[in-house]
A protein has these predicted regions:
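Short runs of predominantly hydrophobic/aromatic residues within well-ordered alpha helices
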Residues: 6, 10, 36, 40-44, ...
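Context-gated lysine
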Residues: 3, 26, 31, 36, ...
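N-terminal interaction modules that seed assembly of large macromolecular complexes
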Residues: 19-64
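Low-complexity intrinsically disordered segments
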Residues: 87-158
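Long amphipathic alpha-helical segments
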Residues: 48-115
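Extended hydrophobic/Leu-rich segments
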Residues: 13, 17-20, 24, 42-43, ...
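Short amphipathic alpha-helical segments and their helix-coil junctions
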Residues: 1, 5-35, 124
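Alpha-helical repeat scaffolds in large eukaryotic proteins
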Residues: 18, 22-25, 48-56, 74, ...
């Protein structure tokens, strides 16, 4: 049951992330292929991180679901040609990003700190100039994920 649910969650998250990237491409906001890949990774980190704190499922189910989402995501990277070392690097990077975002939330900061960190990470790793408008990507992602969580809640209540 968790595997099936996690597959659905991962598909929904992937759709949100892909739609976000497509929207950025249409607005000519993606500066290079590396910029696009860094944005994908960071969007994934934000969405997975936000799911960790959601109350859409009871805590134990949420943890199992997130573990399975991670496993399926990392397996998809392997299927798409990533080496074991590259997959481990992505896993390590996700964990580092979670720690960074956790630090903002533990200080009772709002999502401005998360958005700033997001934009800074993208610019540093994509070797682009800091684009302050990228801070808003976090808000857009979280809004879309919240809508998806609302759908899950409604489906569970039915």
């Amino acid at each position: 049951m968790i595997k099936v649910g996690a597959t659905r969650v991962l598909e929904d998250f992937a759709q949100i992330i892909n739609d976000t990237i497509s929207h950025l491409e249409k607005e000519d906001r993606i500066k290079s292929p590396i910029h696009k890949e860094v944005l994908k990774l960071e969007c994934t980190a934000v969405v997975f991180w936000f799911f960790r704190y959601s109350d859409v499922f009871p805590e134990s189910i949420r943890r199992f679901t997130l573990d399975e989402v991670h496993q399926q995501y990392l397996s998809s990277l392997k299927r798409n040609g990533y080496s074991r070392d590259q997959v481990q690097a992505v896993c390590d990077e996700l964990n580092e990003r979670y720690k960074t975002y956790d630090a903002f939330m533990s200080k009772a900061e709002d999502f401005v700190g998360v958005g700033t960190s997001f934009a800074r990470f993208v610019s540093e790793n994509a070797k682009t100039g800091l684009d302050a408008t990228e801070m808003t990507i976090v808000i857009d992602l979280i809004d879309q994920v919240r809508l998806k969580f609302k759908e899950y809640r409604e489906a569970m209540a039915a």
